[in-house]
Regions:
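Hydrophobic alpha-helical transmembrane segments
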Residues: 106-114, 325-346
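Loop-to-helix entry and N-terminal half of a specific, functionally important transmembrane alpha helix
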Residues: 349-387
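Hydrophobic, glycine- and aromatic-enriched re-entrant/interface helices and adjoining loop segments
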Residues: 234-332
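A juxtamembrane structural motif centered on a specific transmembrane helix
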Residues: 174-191, 376-426
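A structural signal for hydrophobic alpha-helical transmembrane segments in multi-pass membrane proteins
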Residues: 48-148, 192-195, 329, 366-370, ...
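Soluble N-terminal domains of membrane-associated systems
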Residues: 1-77, 81
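Hydrophobic alpha-helical segments of polytopic membrane proteins
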Residues: 190-196, 207-255
Length: 426
């Protein structure tokens, strides 16, 4: 049997695929041999017959080599390229041709380089260095916030997107904690809480920290459902439910006892737009005015919108609204369709994963992408409180381009190796 498997695996060019394939073939042969033993054959003869029935190892190996090799998701790469170009075009009316060419175009090219580099890397390293990667990220963020990144009005804009890198790192941490039972779940919950505090500290944004908390809780539940921490799934999920409910109630109480804070006032203004339209609710008046005066094709006719100071617009966080106003509703629909196609490509990658780490890493990247897409679009049409948002391809800046390039690269890396890495090979 060993010689048969060696000849077979020698035909497979991808070295990383050999171990998993050898294990699969070995299990299949042993199962068949066991069936022959139960039928009355001796062990050696049963094993010999099972090997003979497998056929020519060279032909089988060549056939498996066609399947178990790295693959590129060209569809997702194409959608990424189209959205990158569309994003540059959409930014031009807001920031000008000189800015787009001198800065954002460079960020886009660098981003594509990062996508390719991460795609070619072995994402399974996250399953071995997740905890160490989290510590390194925290050190880098601490140094960056203190000495490098620009702080504006108490906030560090770059950190509002960079902290999302904690999410795929958490996927690697969960994989490291697998098979360790309830204690690992409790530790994972503690890591989620610590990450929330760190994200809040670095980004100075409750919404960003909340988004990260949400993504990490979903990842933890997914890991439990997959049986990574044992079979007592219902108890573990109830434990997480209690923690999430308690924290939600606690933060709700904090907001209620701090009604005069700007966060609470902006939230109240979202539900009482007419009453607060000259104060915190002026954002929603601008959004309503822009949408009301937009056309199906071409630029809208609201000088009020163009001249009004709107931080979300000047920073590019609400670019979908600007696209609708400057290019028309049809352009907005096309842009939305492209984003939907991109998200569907990501969903397809997540859905196809069979090994635990690939499933968690792809899910982590997908969650960050979809949360920011949905949140940014809803904000742009006035269906969500105005807050910090970084929509993929539609928010300017080097940090945004870098983070989304890493996430897209990880998705492509998972897809590239989905027919190579088995659970045992990781």
């Amino acid at each position: 049997m060993e010689e048969f498997i060696k000849i077979l695996t020698d035909q497979i060019r991808c070295v990383k695929a050999r171990q998993g394939i050898a294990q699969e073939i070995s299990n299949h042969i042993l199962d068949q041999a066991e069936a022959y033993e139960q039928a009355g054959l001796e062990h050696d003869k049963a094993l010999e017959r099972a090997v003979q029935e497998m056929g020519d190892p060279v032909e089988i190996g060549i056939s498996m080599d066609r399947i178990h090799r790295p693959q590129i998701n060209w569809k997702m790469l194409l959608v990424t390229f189209i959205l990158s170009i569309a994003g540059l075009v959409c930014m031009t009316p807001m920031f000008g041709v000189s800015y787009v060419i001198s800065r954002q175009l460079i960020f886009t090219f660098v981003g594509f380089g990062v996508i390719v580099a991460v795609c070619l890397m072995d994402y399974s390293a996250l399953g071995r260095i997740g905890i160490a990667a989290g510590i390194v990220l925290t050190i880098v963020f601490t140094i960056g916030k203190r000495y490098y990144f620009q702080t504006i009005n108490g906030r560090t804009p770059a950190m509002s997107i960079l902290v999302y890198l904690y999410v795929p790192v958490f996927a690697g941490i969960l994989y490291q904690l697998r098979k360790k039972g309830l204690s690992a779940v409790v530790l994972a919950v503690g890591i989620v809480g610590l990450t929330f505090v760190l994200a809040m500290h670095f980004s100075s944004s409750l919404m960003v920290a909340g988004n990260i908390f949400f993504c990490m809780i979903i990842l933890l539940v997914a890991a439990i459902v997959k049986g990574m921490f044992g079979n007592n799934k219902k108890y573990m999920i109830r434990l997480i439910g209690i923690v999430v409910t308690s924290l939600t109630a606690f933060f709700g109480w904090l907001l209620w006892t701090n009604k005069d804070s700007y966060r609470v006032q902006r939230l109240i203004a979202f539900f009482n737009r007419i009453k607060y339209q000259d104060a915190e609710g002026y954002y929603y008046r601008v959004i309503q005015e822009a949408l009301h005066n937009s056309k199906w094709i071409g630029t809208g006719n609201s000088t009020y919108f163009e001249n009004y100071y709107f931080p979300g617009l000047t920073e590019g966080e609400l670019l979908p609204l600007a696209v609708i106003y400057w290019f028309g509703f049809i352009a907005g629909v096309i842009l939305l369709a492209l984003l939907a196609g991109f998200i569907l490509c990501a969903i397809n990658i997540v859905r196809r994963q069979k090994n635990q780490l690939g499933a968690l890493v792809s899910l982590a990247c997908f969650l960050v992408l979809v949360v920011n897409c949905v949140e940014g679009i809803l904000i742009s049409v006035g269906l969500f409180p105005v807050t910090t948002a970084a929509i993929p391809f539609l928010t300017r800046g080097g940090s945004t381009a870098l983070v989304y390039a890493v996430l897209i690269g990880l998705l492509l890396s998972v897809h590239r190796r989905e027919k190579i890495l088995t659970q045992e090979a990781i």
